[in-house]
Protein backbone atom coordinates (compact mmCIF):
# COMPACT_ATOMS: atom_id res chain seq x y z
CA UNK A 1 0.00 0.00 0.00
CA UNK A 2 1.28 3.44 -0.86
CA UNK A 3 0.17 6.71 0.69
CA UNK A 4 0.00 10.15 -0.81
CA UNK A 5 2.34 12.72 0.73
CA UNK A 6 0.73 15.01 3.33
CA UNK A 7 1.52 18.45 4.65
CA UNK A 8 2.86 16.81 7.78
CA UNK A 9 5.97 15.58 5.97
CA UNK A 10 9.28 16.95 7.17
CA UNK A 11 10.07 20.48 6.06
CA UNK A 12 13.31 19.02 4.71
CA UNK A 13 11.26 18.02 1.67
CA UNK A 14 10.59 21.62 0.74
CA UNK A 15 11.55 22.66 -2.77
CA UNK A 16 14.61 24.79 -3.31
CA UNK A 17 17.51 22.70 -1.99
CA UNK A 18 18.19 21.16 -5.42
CA UNK A 19 16.17 23.55 -7.53
CA UNK A 20 16.64 24.23 -11.21
CA UNK A 21 17.80 27.85 -10.92
CA UNK A 22 17.79 29.76 -14.21
CA UNK A 23 19.22 33.15 -15.26
CA UNK A 24 17.23 36.36 -14.87
CA UNK A 25 14.86 34.81 -12.34
CA UNK A 26 13.10 32.67 -14.97
CA UNK A 27 11.07 30.08 -13.07
CA UNK A 28 11.67 31.59 -9.63
CA UNK A 29 8.00 32.53 -9.37
CA UNK A 30 5.10 30.48 -10.77
CA UNK A 31 4.36 31.19 -14.42
CA UNK A 32 1.53 33.42 -15.65
CA UNK A 33 0.28 33.04 -19.19
CA UNK A 34 -2.15 31.61 -21.73
CA UNK A 35 -2.26 28.29 -23.60
CA UNK A 36 -4.12 27.09 -26.70
CA UNK A 37 -5.25 23.66 -25.47
CA UNK A 38 -8.22 24.25 -23.15
CA UNK A 39 -9.63 26.82 -25.55
CA UNK A 40 -9.00 25.20 -28.95
CA UNK A 41 -7.49 21.71 -28.61
CA UNK A 42 -5.86 20.81 -31.93
CA UNK A 43 -7.75 23.49 -33.86
CA UNK A 44 -4.95 26.05 -33.72
CA UNK A 45 -3.19 28.42 -36.08
CA UNK A 46 -1.08 31.55 -36.04
CA UNK A 47 -4.11 33.82 -36.13
CA UNK A 48 -5.59 32.36 -32.93
CA UNK A 49 -2.27 32.53 -31.14
CA UNK A 50 -1.59 36.12 -32.18
CA UNK A 51 -5.14 37.14 -31.29
CA UNK A 52 -4.57 35.77 -27.80
CA UNK A 53 -1.33 37.74 -27.56
CA UNK A 54 -3.02 40.95 -28.67
CA UNK A 55 -5.94 40.43 -26.30
CA UNK A 56 -3.52 39.76 -23.45
CA UNK A 57 -2.43 43.36 -23.91
CA UNK A 58 -5.82 44.88 -24.78
CA UNK A 59 -7.55 43.32 -21.77
CA UNK A 60 -4.88 44.40 -19.30
CA UNK A 61 -3.66 40.87 -18.64
CA UNK A 62 -0.07 41.75 -19.53
CA UNK A 63 -0.21 44.62 -17.06
CA UNK A 64 -1.54 42.15 -14.48
CA UNK A 65 1.56 39.97 -14.97
CA UNK A 66 0.57 37.40 -17.60
CA UNK A 67 3.48 37.02 -20.00
CA UNK A 68 3.60 33.62 -21.75
CA UNK A 69 1.59 32.82 -24.89
CA UNK A 70 1.91 29.06 -25.25
CA UNK A 71 1.27 26.87 -28.28
CA UNK A 72 0.19 23.39 -27.18
CA UNK A 73 -0.06 20.14 -29.20
CA UNK A 74 -0.71 19.89 -32.97
CA UNK A 75 1.59 22.66 -34.22
CA UNK A 76 3.80 20.49 -36.44
CA UNK A 77 3.58 18.32 -39.54
CA UNK A 78 2.11 15.02 -38.37
CA UNK A 79 3.80 12.72 -40.86
CA UNK A 80 7.26 12.97 -39.36
CA UNK A 81 10.51 14.88 -39.06
CA UNK A 82 12.63 16.43 -41.76
CA UNK A 83 14.45 13.42 -43.28
CA UNK A 84 17.75 15.29 -43.47
CA UNK A 85 17.93 17.54 -40.42
CA UNK A 86 15.67 15.36 -38.23
CA UNK A 87 13.98 18.53 -37.02
CA UNK A 88 10.28 18.76 -36.24
CA UNK A 89 8.61 20.69 -39.06
CA UNK A 90 6.06 23.40 -38.20
CA UNK A 91 2.78 22.98 -40.11
CA UNK A 92 2.92 25.71 -42.75
CA UNK A 93 -0.85 25.61 -43.25
CA UNK A 94 -1.34 26.57 -39.61
CA UNK A 95 1.77 28.68 -39.21
CA UNK A 96 2.73 30.17 -42.60
CA UNK A 97 5.67 32.08 -41.09
CA UNK A 98 6.73 29.13 -38.99
CA UNK A 99 6.92 29.10 -35.22
CA UNK A 100 9.76 31.62 -35.37
CA UNK A 101 7.53 34.07 -37.23
CA UNK A 102 4.82 33.84 -34.59
CA UNK A 103 7.41 34.07 -31.82
CA UNK A 104 8.88 37.22 -33.33
CA UNK A 105 5.48 38.93 -33.43
CA UNK A 106 4.72 37.90 -29.86
CA UNK A 107 8.09 39.20 -28.71
CA UNK A 108 7.39 42.49 -30.48
CA UNK A 109 4.35 42.83 -28.21
CA UNK A 110 6.56 42.49 -25.15
CA UNK A 111 5.38 38.96 -24.39
CA UNK A 112 7.02 35.54 -24.35
CA UNK A 113 6.13 32.40 -26.28
CA UNK A 114 5.87 28.74 -25.35
CA UNK A 115 5.85 25.48 -27.31
CA UNK A 116 4.85 21.88 -26.60
CA UNK A 117 6.39 18.44 -27.01
CA UNK A 118 6.39 15.09 -25.21
CA UNK A 119 8.97 12.82 -23.59
CA UNK A 120 7.99 9.99 -25.93
CA UNK A 121 7.98 9.09 -29.61
CA UNK A 122 4.75 10.96 -30.33
CA UNK A 123 2.63 13.59 -28.62
CA UNK A 124 -0.77 12.96 -27.06
CA UNK A 125 -2.39 13.88 -30.38
CA UNK A 126 -0.02 11.70 -32.40
CA UNK A 127 2.50 14.30 -33.64
CA UNK A 128 6.30 13.84 -33.59
CA UNK A 129 7.74 14.11 -30.07
CA UNK A 130 11.19 14.54 -28.61
CA UNK A 131 12.41 11.31 -26.98
CA UNK A 132 15.82 10.64 -28.52
CA UNK A 133 15.81 14.03 -30.25
CA UNK A 134 16.17 16.26 -27.21
CA UNK A 135 19.28 18.11 -28.38
CA UNK A 136 17.92 18.72 -31.89
CA UNK A 137 14.58 19.95 -30.59
CA UNK A 138 16.07 22.15 -27.88
CA UNK A 139 18.26 23.77 -30.52
CA UNK A 140 15.23 24.30 -32.77
CA UNK A 141 13.22 25.82 -29.94
CA UNK A 142 16.06 28.19 -29.04
CA UNK A 143 16.56 29.19 -32.68
CA UNK A 144 12.83 29.92 -33.03
CA UNK A 145 12.85 32.18 -29.95
CA UNK A 146 10.95 29.91 -27.58
CA UNK A 147 10.77 30.93 -23.91
CA UNK A 148 8.72 28.09 -22.37
CA UNK A 149 8.42 24.35 -23.00
CA UNK A 150 5.49 22.24 -21.84
CA UNK A 151 6.76 18.65 -21.96
CA UNK A 152 4.09 15.94 -21.91
CA UNK A 153 4.21 12.21 -21.09
CA UNK A 154 2.61 10.53 -24.12
CA UNK A 155 4.08 8.07 -26.60
CA UNK A 156 6.41 6.36 -24.14
CA UNK A 157 7.86 3.15 -25.65
CA UNK A 158 7.93 0.01 -23.51
CA UNK A 159 11.70 0.14 -23.03
CA UNK A 160 11.27 3.55 -21.35
CA UNK A 161 8.42 2.68 -18.97
CA UNK A 162 9.15 2.49 -15.24
CA UNK A 163 9.90 -0.69 -13.36
CA UNK A 164 7.53 0.32 -10.56
CA UNK A 165 4.24 2.21 -10.26
CA UNK A 166 3.85 5.26 -8.04
CA UNK A 167 0.62 6.04 -6.19
CA UNK A 168 -1.23 8.91 -7.88
CA UNK A 169 -4.77 8.82 -6.41
CA UNK A 170 -6.40 10.42 -9.43
CA UNK A 171 -9.49 9.29 -11.34
CA UNK A 172 -7.33 8.95 -14.45
CA UNK A 173 -5.75 5.97 -12.66
CA UNK A 174 -8.86 4.36 -11.16
CA UNK A 175 -11.43 5.07 -8.49
CA UNK A 176 -10.42 3.35 -5.23
CA UNK A 177 -8.07 5.50 -3.16
CA UNK A 178 -9.10 5.23 0.51
CA UNK A 179 -7.86 8.43 2.16
CA UNK A 180 -5.28 8.95 -0.56
CA UNK A 181 -3.82 5.45 -0.53
CA UNK A 182 -3.43 3.03 -3.42
CA UNK A 183 -4.08 -0.43 -1.95
CA UNK A 184 -4.62 -1.98 -5.37
CA UNK A 185 -1.53 -0.52 -7.03
CA UNK A 186 0.34 -2.96 -9.23
CA UNK A 187 4.06 -3.36 -8.78
CA UNK A 188 4.71 -0.74 -6.05
CA UNK A 189 8.28 0.39 -5.49
CA UNK A 190 10.33 -0.76 -2.49
CA UNK A 191 10.15 1.65 0.44
CA UNK A 192 13.59 3.19 -0.11
CA UNK A 193 13.37 3.34 -3.90
CA UNK A 194 14.90 6.47 -5.42
CA UNK A 195 12.47 7.69 -8.07
CA UNK A 196 15.06 10.09 -9.46
CA UNK A 197 16.66 7.01 -11.04
CA UNK A 198 13.41 5.98 -12.76
CA UNK A 199 13.02 5.96 -16.52
CA UNK A 200 10.48 8.78 -16.25
CA UNK A 201 12.98 10.99 -14.43
CA UNK A 202 15.67 10.14 -16.97
CA UNK A 203 13.40 11.03 -19.90
CA UNK A 204 12.65 14.42 -18.37
CA UNK A 205 16.25 15.01 -17.32
CA UNK A 206 17.39 14.44 -20.90
CA UNK A 207 15.34 17.39 -22.10
CA UNK A 208 16.41 19.48 -19.12
CA UNK A 209 20.04 18.91 -20.05
CA UNK A 210 19.34 19.74 -23.69
CA UNK A 211 17.62 23.00 -22.72
CA UNK A 212 20.52 23.92 -20.45
CA UNK A 213 22.85 23.34 -23.39
CA UNK A 214 21.35 26.01 -25.66
CA UNK A 215 22.05 29.72 -25.65
CA UNK A 216 18.56 30.70 -24.50
CA UNK A 217 16.75 30.50 -21.17
CA UNK A 218 13.63 28.36 -21.63
CA UNK A 219 11.26 27.76 -18.73
CA UNK A 220 10.71 24.01 -18.38
CA UNK A 221 7.20 22.80 -17.45
CA UNK A 222 6.96 19.06 -16.78
CA UNK A 223 3.64 17.44 -17.69
CA UNK A 224 4.20 13.90 -16.34
CA UNK A 225 0.80 13.62 -14.56
CA UNK A 226 2.28 13.08 -11.08
CA UNK A 227 3.95 9.84 -12.13
CA UNK A 228 7.22 8.46 -10.73
CA UNK A 229 6.90 10.43 -7.47
CA UNK A 230 7.88 13.56 -9.38
CA UNK A 231 7.53 15.68 -6.26
CA UNK A 232 10.81 14.22 -4.99
CA UNK A 233 12.85 15.08 -8.10
CA UNK A 234 10.82 17.51 -10.21
CA UNK A 235 12.33 20.62 -8.59
CA UNK A 236 15.80 19.69 -9.80
CA UNK A 237 14.53 18.91 -13.28
CA UNK A 238 11.97 21.59 -14.14
CA UNK A 239 10.36 24.78 -12.93
CA UNK A 240 6.95 23.14 -12.38
CA UNK A 241 5.59 19.62 -12.55
CA UNK A 242 2.11 18.27 -13.06
CA UNK A 243 0.60 16.44 -10.12
CA UNK A 244 -2.46 14.82 -11.75
CA UNK A 245 -4.07 13.84 -15.02
CA UNK A 246 -5.71 16.51 -17.17
CA UNK A 247 -8.19 19.07 -15.90
CA UNK A 248 -11.61 19.52 -17.53
CA UNK A 249 -14.16 22.36 -17.16
CA UNK A 250 -16.22 20.28 -14.74
CA UNK A 251 -16.64 21.19 -11.09
CA UNK A 252 -16.17 17.60 -9.93
CA UNK A 253 -12.80 17.44 -11.68
CA UNK A 254 -11.62 20.82 -10.41
CA UNK A 255 -12.27 19.96 -6.75
CA UNK A 256 -10.75 16.51 -7.21
CA UNK A 257 -7.52 18.08 -8.44
CA UNK A 258 -7.60 20.75 -5.72
CA UNK A 259 -7.89 17.99 -3.14
CA UNK A 260 -4.92 16.07 -4.55
CA UNK A 261 -2.71 19.13 -4.88
CA UNK A 262 -3.53 20.37 -1.38
CA UNK A 263 -1.48 17.51 0.08
CA UNK A 264 1.62 18.57 -1.87
CA UNK A 265 2.10 22.15 -0.73
CA UNK A 266 5.31 21.46 1.20
CA UNK A 267 7.00 20.90 -2.16
CA UNK A 268 6.19 24.40 -3.44
CA UNK A 269 8.63 27.27 -3.04
CA UNK A 270 10.85 29.53 -5.12
CA UNK A 271 12.05 27.87 -8.35
CA UNK A 272 9.64 24.93 -8.22
CA UNK A 273 5.86 24.49 -8.08
CA UNK A 274 3.47 21.50 -8.13
CA UNK A 275 1.14 22.11 -11.08
CA UNK A 276 -2.55 21.09 -10.86
CA UNK A 277 -2.95 21.89 -14.59
CA UNK A 278 -4.10 24.89 -16.55
CA UNK A 279 -7.03 27.12 -15.68
CA UNK A 280 -10.58 26.44 -16.86
CA UNK A 281 -11.89 29.87 -15.84
CA UNK A 282 -14.36 30.93 -18.54
CA UNK A 283 -14.91 27.42 -19.91
CA UNK A 284 -17.78 24.92 -19.76
CA UNK A 285 -20.78 25.49 -17.53
CA UNK A 286 -18.97 26.53 -14.38
CA UNK A 287 -20.88 29.04 -12.28
CA UNK A 288 -19.39 32.39 -11.36
CA UNK A 289 -18.79 31.06 -7.85
CA UNK A 290 -17.03 27.96 -9.20
CA UNK A 291 -14.80 30.04 -11.48
CA UNK A 292 -13.92 32.24 -8.51
CA UNK A 293 -13.13 29.31 -6.21
CA UNK A 294 -11.08 27.58 -8.92
CA UNK A 295 -8.91 30.65 -9.48
CA UNK A 296 -8.51 31.53 -5.80
CA UNK A 297 -7.37 28.01 -4.89
CA UNK A 298 -4.92 27.81 -7.81
CA UNK A 299 -3.50 31.25 -6.96
CA UNK A 300 -3.23 30.45 -3.24
CA UNK A 301 -1.41 27.19 -4.04
CA UNK A 302 1.00 29.24 -6.20
CA UNK A 303 0.28 26.96 -9.11
CA UNK A 304 1.27 28.17 -12.58
CA UNK A 305 -1.71 30.26 -13.72
CA UNK A 306 -2.10 29.47 -17.40
CA UNK A 307 -5.34 30.82 -18.86
CA UNK A 308 -7.16 28.40 -21.17
CA UNK A 309 -10.12 30.28 -22.60
CA UNK A 310 -10.64 32.29 -25.80
CA UNK A 311 -9.66 35.82 -24.84
CA UNK A 312 -11.48 37.52 -27.69
CA UNK A 313 -14.81 36.35 -26.26
CA UNK A 314 -14.17 36.32 -22.51
CA UNK A 315 -16.80 38.04 -20.38
CA UNK A 316 -16.07 40.80 -17.89
CA UNK A 317 -16.79 38.70 -14.80
CA UNK A 318 -14.30 36.01 -15.79
CA UNK A 319 -11.73 38.61 -16.81
CA UNK A 320 -12.06 40.32 -13.43
CA UNK A 321 -11.35 37.01 -11.69
CA UNK A 322 -8.19 36.45 -13.76
CA UNK A 323 -6.98 39.99 -13.03
CA UNK A 324 -7.67 40.00 -9.29
CA UNK A 325 -4.82 42.11 -7.94
CA UNK A 326 -4.55 40.80 -4.36
CA UNK A 327 -4.55 37.14 -5.42
CA UNK A 328 -1.98 37.78 -8.15
CA UNK A 329 0.08 39.79 -5.68
CA UNK A 330 0.10 36.87 -3.25
CA UNK A 331 0.91 34.47 -6.10
CA UNK A 332 3.86 36.56 -7.31
CA UNK A 333 5.30 37.47 -3.90
CA UNK A 334 9.03 38.17 -4.45
CA UNK A 335 9.94 37.60 -0.79
CA UNK A 336 7.84 34.63 0.37
CA UNK A 337 7.92 31.60 -1.92
CA UNK A 338 5.73 29.18 0.00
CA UNK A 339 2.02 29.00 -0.88
CA UNK A 340 -1.01 29.07 1.37
CA UNK A 341 -1.57 25.86 3.33
CA UNK A 342 -4.84 24.33 4.52
CA UNK A 343 -5.21 24.89 8.26
CA UNK A 344 -8.64 23.27 8.73
CA UNK A 345 -10.63 20.92 6.52
CA UNK A 346 -14.08 22.13 7.58
CA UNK A 347 -16.50 19.72 5.92
CA UNK A 348 -14.30 16.76 6.88
CA UNK A 349 -11.98 15.97 9.78
CA UNK A 350 -8.51 17.40 9.19
CA UNK A 351 -6.27 15.49 6.76
CA UNK A 352 -9.20 13.75 5.07
CA UNK A 353 -8.57 12.93 1.42
CA UNK A 354 -11.93 13.62 -0.24
CA UNK A 355 -12.17 14.24 -4.01
CA UNK A 356 -15.51 16.03 -3.61
CA UNK A 357 -14.70 18.12 -0.53
CA UNK A 358 -11.14 19.48 -0.36
CA UNK A 359 -9.79 21.39 2.59
CA UNK A 360 -11.98 24.47 3.06
CA UNK A 361 -9.82 26.78 5.21
CA UNK A 362 -6.47 28.09 3.92
CA UNK A 363 -3.99 30.73 5.01
CA UNK A 364 -0.64 32.02 3.88
CA UNK A 365 1.85 34.76 4.78
CA UNK A 366 2.45 37.61 2.36
CA UNK A 367 4.97 40.42 2.00
CA UNK A 368 2.75 42.20 -0.52
CA UNK A 369 -0.76 42.21 0.95
CA UNK A 370 -0.10 43.91 4.25
CA UNK A 371 -1.44 40.90 6.09
CA UNK A 372 -2.32 37.22 5.87
CA UNK A 373 -4.27 35.66 3.01
CA UNK A 374 -7.25 33.69 4.35
CA UNK A 375 -9.62 31.61 2.23
CA UNK A 376 -12.91 30.02 3.33
CA UNK A 377 -14.45 27.65 0.82
CA UNK A 378 -17.93 26.10 0.65
CA UNK A 379 -17.53 22.74 -1.08
CA UNK A 380 -21.16 21.80 -0.46
CA UNK A 381 -24.08 21.95 -2.89
CA UNK A 382 -26.10 24.54 -0.95
CA UNK A 383 -25.41 27.84 0.81
CA UNK A 384 -23.49 27.43 4.08
CA UNK A 385 -21.85 29.58 6.74
CA UNK A 386 -18.08 29.49 7.12
CA UNK A 387 -16.17 31.09 9.99
CA UNK A 388 -12.51 32.09 10.18
CA UNK A 389 -11.44 32.04 13.82
CA UNK A 390 -8.32 34.15 14.29
CA UNK A 391 -6.84 31.88 16.97
CA UNK A 392 -7.00 28.90 14.57
CA UNK A 393 -5.03 30.58 11.79
CA UNK A 394 -1.32 29.66 12.02
CA UNK A 395 -0.08 33.11 11.03
CA UNK A 396 -2.28 34.79 13.67
CA UNK A 397 -2.66 32.35 16.55
CA UNK A 398 0.46 33.47 18.44
CA UNK A 399 -0.92 37.00 18.71
CA UNK A 400 -4.65 36.27 18.67
CA UNK A 401 -6.28 36.27 22.07
CA UNK A 402 -9.92 36.45 23.05
CA UNK A 403 -11.10 39.87 21.98
CA UNK A 404 -8.31 40.32 19.45
CA UNK A 405 -9.23 42.30 16.38
CA UNK A 406 -7.68 42.67 12.94
CA UNK A 407 -8.30 44.96 10.01
CA UNK A 408 -9.96 42.82 7.33
CA UNK A 409 -10.37 43.45 3.60
CA UNK A 410 -12.57 41.50 1.19
CA UNK A 411 -10.35 40.52 -1.74
CA UNK A 412 -13.20 40.20 -4.24
CA UNK A 413 -14.81 43.57 -3.61
CA UNK A 414 -11.92 45.51 -2.11
CA UNK A 415 -14.22 46.50 0.75
CA UNK A 416 -12.63 47.43 4.06
CA UNK A 417 -14.57 45.31 6.56
CA UNK A 418 -13.19 47.25 9.50
CA UNK A 419 -11.83 45.95 12.78
CA UNK A 420 -13.11 42.40 13.17
CA UNK A 421 -12.90 40.82 16.62
CA UNK A 422 -12.16 37.12 17.25
CA UNK A 423 -13.61 35.71 14.04
CA UNK A 424 -15.25 36.48 10.72
CA UNK A 425 -18.42 34.69 9.67
CA UNK A 426 -19.80 34.67 6.14
CA UNK A 427 -22.57 32.90 4.26
CA UNK A 428 -21.27 31.44 1.01
CA UNK A 429 -23.28 30.22 -1.92
CA UNK A 430 -22.65 26.68 -3.15
CA UNK A 431 -19.05 26.23 -4.33
CA UNK A 432 -18.11 29.84 -3.58
CA UNK A 433 -15.03 31.03 -1.72
CA UNK A 434 -14.38 33.98 0.57
CA UNK A 435 -10.96 35.58 0.16
CA UNK A 436 -9.67 37.96 2.83
CA UNK A 437 -6.61 39.93 3.79
CA UNK A 438 -6.34 39.87 7.58
CA UNK A 439 -4.09 42.81 8.34
CA UNK A 440 -2.93 44.84 11.32
CA UNK A 441 -4.28 44.27 14.80
CA UNK A 442 -6.77 46.84 16.03
From Swiss-Prot:
Q: Which residues bind substrate?
A: 224-228
Where is the catalytic site?
Answer: 152, 246
Which CDD domains is this protein grouped with? GH27
Q: Which residues form the signal peptide?
A: 1-19
The GO molecular function terms of this record are: alpha-galactosidase activity
Function, in words: Hydrolyzes a variety of simple alpha-D-galactoside as well as more complex molecules such as oligosaccharides and polysaccharides.
Record-linked InterPro entries = Aldolase_TIM (IPR013785), Glyco_hydro_27 (IPR002241), Glyco_hydro_27/36_CS (IPR000111), Glyco_hydro_b (IPR013780), Glycoside_hydrolase_SF (IPR017853), Melibiase_C (IPR041233)
Q: What's the source species for this entry?
A: Aspergillus flavus (strain ATCC 200026 / FGSC A1120 / IAM 13836 / NRRL 3357 / JCM 12722 / SRRC 167)
- Please verify whether the record's keywords include Repeat: no
Major place of residence: secreted
Q: List the disulfide bonds.
A: 42-74, 124-154
| Gene (UniProt) | aglB
Q: What is its EC number?
A: 3.2.1.22
The entry's cellular-component GO terms read: extracellular region
Q: Which Pfam families match?
A: Melibiase_2, Melibiase_C
| UniProt-annotated location(s) | Secreted
User: Which processes are annotated in GO (biological process)?
Assistant: carbohydrate metabolic process
**PROSITE patterns recorded:** ALPHA_GALACTOSIDASE
Entry similarity comment: Belongs to the glycosyl hydrolase 27 family.
Q: Does the keyword Hydrolase apply?
A: yes
List of glycosylated residues: 159, 173, 179, 215, 235, 285
Identification of the protein by name: Probable alpha-galactosidase B
Please give the catalytic activity noted in the UniProt record: Hydrolysis of terminal, non-reducing alpha-D-galactose residues in alpha-D-galactosides, including galactose oligosaccharides, galactomannans and galactolipids
Q: Which UniProt keywords apply?
A: Disulfide bond, Glycoprotein, Glycosidase, Hydrolase, Secreted, Signal
